[in-house]
Design a protein with these regions (language model features):
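ATP/NTP-dependent adenylation/nucleotidyl-transfer catalytic domains that generate, transfer
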Residues: 1-394
Length: 394
């Protein structure tokens, strides 16, 4: 295995030696989440300077149920000293009622680093290590979305603003390269092959206005469906929650349905279309856009799913103000406040991604579990690749 034409062992040795020179005899705090990026960054630093590293999990309240305890146990099994710092109430109180995606991400970033700054001071540390990788700063500097862990690349000087020096040993690597390092370092498979999880956690999957009830519903259905979601042949699969969308139509939508009928050979009526209230992130050219998402319902769901790629090719030419399209895979029920969207993608580098086919029985099993939560009224499967969509919604 090679990274940048270097033997992986040589590459790791160079990283470790570089970390030793930078850190010297100073103390280091490592921000860890249980993801492969932050774990590899923390573990490399531990290999370099040993117990001068203190690893912290910041409990923002946006992790999945039971995740923090599991992550702490796994990291400790590797030899790391791990502490959990609970600031969930602070994050909830600061974010309640906020609906703009960029505002939510920026509030999260500010609170996150203010918290870390206090911990760095308490631990008498000079450095903060984090697992920023290339797609994080590429998407942020390119204006696609603000990643919470990008500072220096956008002109923020952490030593002046927060009082610590930042170390990002993986900042020029991509996800597949980080996984190569993790495998060589014998990091537990549960971490190594863990699906990516955004730094702000479930906050960015509570799309639109943040409400505690919305978060509770998302946490609940995520627990119900976690094992089923892992059965999808995907690099990443997850659920996001939205306000119940409204029925809609327009000349462009009518034109799209005509095109869908041509693609599928369906005649007659039976289609319903829904517009989501929330704007979602998409990509046009090299720029980010916040645009609309359309939901399509037809009683023969399997028929629509079978031609999803053709629908995706057709819709951007017809619907100029939409960057995403999703197929309703449940029967709508009148009760309930929220809709759930299933998102699954296949990718090697997370810069582009396709949407996998999902067995209809598996999809129905996921729907059945989601609909056990009476707060949910509809379930959709997002069929939009990256681009024109991003993987996450905010």
């Amino acid at each position: 295995m090679k990274i940048y034409d270097k033997n992986i062992e040589e590459f790791i040795d160079e990283l470790i030696n570089s970390l030793r020179k930078i850190i010297g005899d100073k103390n280091v705090l490592a921000a860890v989440s249980g993801g492969v990026d932050s774990t590899v960054a923390a573990y490399l630093t531990w290999l370099a300077v040993g117990d001068k590293v203190k690893a912290y999990i910041i409990d923002t309240g946006f992790m999945r149920e039971g995740e923090i305890e599991k992550v702490k146990s796994l990291l400790e099994s590797m030899g790391l000293q791990v502490k959990v710092h609970d600031v969930s109430e602070l994050f909830y109180n600061s974010l309640l009622g906020k609906s703009d995606a960029e505002e939510k991400r920026k509030i999260f970033r500010e609170l996150f680093y203010e918290t870390l700054a206090k911990l760095v001071k308490e631990e008498n540390a000079d450095f903060l290590v984090q697992g920023t990788i290339a797609p994080d700063w590429i998407e942020t500097t390119g204006g696609i979305k603000t990643q919470h862990n990008v500072l220096t690349q956008i002109g923020i000087k952490p030593e002046l603003k927060y009082g610590f020096n930042l170390i990002e040993p993986l900042a020029n690597l991509y996800k597949d390269q980080v996984r190569m390092l993790a495998k060589y370092l014998k990091i537990p498979e549960e971490i190594r092959e863990r699906q990516p999880f955004p730094g702000p956690g479930l906050l960015v999957r509570c799309v639109g206005e943040f409400e505690l009830e919305k978060l509770k519903a998302l946490k609940n259905v995520t627990v119900l469906c976690e094992d089923l979601l892992m059965k999808i042949d995907a690099s990443q699969s997850f659920l996001a929650i939205f306000k119940k969308p409204r029925m809609t139509t327009s000349k462009e939508i009518v034109d799209l349905i005509k095109e869908v009928k041509n693609i599928t050979g369906i005649g007659g009526r039976g289609f319903k279309t829904f517009e989501f209230y929330e704007k979602v992130t998409g990509i046009k050219g090299d720029s980010r856009v916040y645009s609309k998402m359309l939901g399509i319902y037809y009683k023969e769901t399997e028929l629509l799913l079978r031609v999803k790629d053709e629908i995706v090719k057709a819709f951007p030419k017809i619907l100029k103000n939409y960057t995403r399209i999703a197929i309703m895979v449940s029967e709508p029920r009148p009760a309930g406040k929220y809709a759930i969207v299933i998102r699954a993608v296949k990718t090697s580098d997370f810069m582009t991604a396709s949407v996998p086919d999902v067995d209809i029985k598996l999809l129905q099993n996921i729907v059945d579990e989601v609909m056990k939560d009476k707060r949910i009224t509809q379930v959709y499967y997002d069929i939009t690749p990256k681009p024109p969509a991003t993987i996450e919604y905010e």
